[in-house]
């Protein structure tokens, strides 16, 4: 894969990313990362030999919140990187239309074989 031209060093989320819509709070990726935070709280209890599910509920809630917050920005960065890649790809396709010819659209009748019921 070709590296981006003029990448901004040490920038997690450039100002250009503000134009993208924010990820929804019910995004499955965010919920999964929040669940990983809950699991890390359980593992912390297990390592410290506390009751796994009941000890330190406030700590588990803190892990969930911290992981969800970090995951929000990771998902936002991922969406930004995909948007940059798509913009570059579509720009290339616009500049080189001879490499991407339009294909004729086929109907379902042309794709599927004739149906002959066997009795």
UniProtKB/Swiss-Prot annotation:
The gene is NDUFC2. Complex I is composed of 45 different subunits. Interacts with TMEM242. This is NADH dehydrogenase [ubiquinone] 1 subunit C2. The chain crosses the membrane at residues 56-75. It is found in: Mitochondrion inner membrane. It comes from Pan troglodytes (Chimpanzee). The keyword Coiled coil does not apply. It holds the Pfam family NDUF_C2. It is a single-pass membrane protein.
């Amino acid at each position: 894969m070709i590296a981006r031209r003029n990448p901004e060093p040490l920038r997690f989320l450039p100002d250009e990313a503000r134009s993208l819509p924010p990820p929804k709070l019910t995004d499955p990726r965010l919920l999964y990362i929040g669940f990983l935070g809950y699991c890390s709280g359980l593992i912390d209890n297990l390592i410290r030999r506390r009751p796994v599910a009941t000890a330190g509920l406030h700590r588990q809630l803190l892990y969930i919140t911290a992981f969800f917050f970090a995951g929000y920005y990771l998902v936002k960065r991922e969406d930004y990187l995909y948007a940059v890649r798509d913009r570059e790809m579509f720009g290339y396709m616009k500049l080189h239309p001879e490499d991407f010819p339009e294909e004729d659209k086929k109907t379902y009748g042309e794709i599927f074989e004739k149906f002959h019921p066997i009795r």
